[in-house]
Regions:
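A glycine-rich phosphate-binding loop feature that marks nucleotide/adenosyl-phosphate handling sites
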Residues: 244-247, 281, 296, 326-337
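Extended redox/cofactor-interaction regions of prokaryotic respiratory oxidoreductases
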Residues: 119-186, 191-197, 221-225, 311-426, ...
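Short acidic (Asp/Glu) and glycine-rich catalytic loops that position anionic groups and cofactors
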Residues: 203-208, 254-260, 286-293, 349-351, ...
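Flexible, glycine/charged-enriched surface loops at secondary-structure junctions
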Residues: 101-104, 237-242, 288-290, 321-328
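N-terminal export/assembly segments and adjacent metallocofactor-ligating motifs
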Residues: 1-234, 258, 271, 389, ...
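P-loop NTPase catalytic nucleotide-binding module
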Residues: 218, 222-288
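Short, amphipathic alpha-helical segments that act as regulatory/interfacial helices
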Residues: 90-93, 228, 279, 310-318
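Conserved short loop/turn motifs at secondary-structure junctions
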Residues: 106-114, 267-270, 294-301, 333-334, ...
């Protein structure tokens, strides 16, 4: 913290408008934020910022911002003191648990801007009162990709784009979604890297590609396995890496034989000649190939295996943990700083853990889509209270009418958010939340290298 020549107070922090978490300067006058810009000495963004980050102060001072606790009455919303709201909510939680059991209460943590690190507190709370029912948006976003990578090589990491000879972007549009990643991609391009973009949509980054591959939505896995087949059948894969660091190669090689260029072309609509061209470029660039799968690959019924198939190309080309390839390594270990006990809770039958065991085993959390069925049917047991923080399932979940009916069936619905959302309108209590610029938290950057 410092003061500049204009007597402005300057504080350094991380922007949490997205996962990049750029370093920023906050300029304050009389305790009020008057400007935000990039922190030049921060190694991730090096002083650069996108429009979203520059406008983050609008979250704090927006005229529609929730500032006081609200209680729903027969006459509409009533402002009440925070202490009263917390006391009344606590009494109602106890009543629900006494009537229906400890598991009848749940927490749902959303991903509204700047709320990612609220997970640990939410988990700690719900576990402390005896319920395994922690929900988040991970059911629908990102974790499918994470699981796909973990099934391949144990973790998800970013590519070393500045040193890559080939950058392969699969279902991602970093100019709009990951600005710092795009900076590294531009460095790689300046250093001579070719770029292949695979996406059903002609995105901003696709327009900059050397090769743009437009395929049918959801067929990414077939294309990846077809490329794997070409590399293996032509003996253009990293035999040393495969023999030293992998298991199951023979079974994998046998499985991908059916993914001939002709078969893959029929599945994906990608021309046979283009499939061969991509394989040739990959073989020439290996091991300096930096892959990146976006969330687009996981938004299908075969989403996990789409990403899993692409991760196999990392291994075949020997790209893992090599300059210009995919970075591996331990981050600063935020998981070691969690405030909840990460222990198996299967014996408490968390919602969705039986039907979706892989998801539960990876995340130790419940399935949001199934929560609505549980509220409406009381199966496998009653779910009668929910506390949501920065989540808006009425807007973000499928089947809006079903979501509204399910939430209306609860004995207690509490929403904590920055604004009055569609879900908050249905709540019994609405609590104002602090924005990421108004609270202290531990964060790592998107490359898992820096703790701030």
């Amino acid at each position: 913290m410092s003061a500049d020549n204009n007597h402005r107070e300057v504080k350094h922090t991380l922007c949490r408008m997205c996962a990049d978490r750029c370093g920023v300067n906050l300029y304050l006058e009389n305790g009020r934020i008057v400007d935000i810009d990039g922190f030049k000495d921060y190694p991730v963004n090096k002083g650069r910022m996108c429009v979203k980050g520059r406008a983050a102060q609008d979250l704090v001072y927006h005229p529609d911002r929730l500032l006081k606790p609200l209680k729903k009455t027969d006459h509409g919303w009533q402002e009440i003191p925070l202490e009263q709201a917390l006391d009344e909510i606590a009494v109602k939680i106890k009543k629900v648990q006494q009537q229906y059991g400890e598991r009848a209460v749940s927490v749902w943590k959303g991903e509204a801007v700047g709320f990612a690190q609220q997970e640990d507190i939410a988990r700690r709370f719900i576990h402390a009162i005896g319920s395994p029912n922690y929900f988040s948006n991970d059911t629908a976003c990102w974790v499918g990709k994470y699981i796909g990578y973990c099934l391949g090589y144990g973790q998800w990491q970013m590519g070393d784009y500045p040193q890559a000879k080939l950058i392969m972007l699969w279902g991602v549009n970093p100019p709009y979604s990951m600005a710092t990643m795009m900076q590294d991609i531009m460095k790689g391009r300046e250093n001579g890297a070719k770029m292949i973009v695979i996406d059903p949509r002609l995105s901003a980054v696709a327009r900059q590609a050397d090769i743009y591959v437009q395929l049918r939505p959801g067929t990414d896995g077939a294309l990846a396995l077809g490329l794997a087949n070409l590399l293996i059948s032509s003996n253009r894969y990293d035999r040393d890496f495969i023999s030293r660091f992998t298991v199951g190669f023979d079974k994998f090689a046998a499985y991908v034989k059916k993914f001939t260029p002709e078969y893959v072309s029929a599945e994906t609509s990608v021309p046979v000649a283009v499939i061969h061209e991509i394989a040739d470029i990959m073989a020439a660039a290996a091991p300096q190939i930096a892959f990146h799968c976006g969330n687009g690959l996981e938004h299908h019924i075969n989403g996990v295996n789409n990403v899993r198939a692409v991760s196999m190309l990392d291994a075949l080309n020997g790209c893992l943990d090599t300059p210009g390839g995919t970075r591996l390594g331990e981050g600063p270990g935020l998981r070691g700083l969690t405030l909840y006990d990460e222990i198996p809770l299967r014996h408490l039958e968390p919602i969705g853990s039986t039907k979706y065991p892989v998801f539960y085993d990876f995340r130790q959390e419940c399935h949001t889509m199934m929560s609505m069925d549980t509220m409406l049917t009381d199966k496998p047991y009653p779910l009668k209270a929910m506390l949501l923080t920065a989540a808006n399932p009425v807007l973000s979940n499928p089947n809006t009418d079903k979501v509204k009916k399910a939430l209306a069936s609860l004995d207690l619905l509490v929403v904590r958010d920055l604004f009055m959302t569609e879900t908050a309108e249905l709540a019994d209590y609405v609590l104002p939340a602090a924005s990421f610029l108004e609270r202290e938290e531990l964060h790592s950057d998107s490359y898992q290298q820096i703790l701030a």
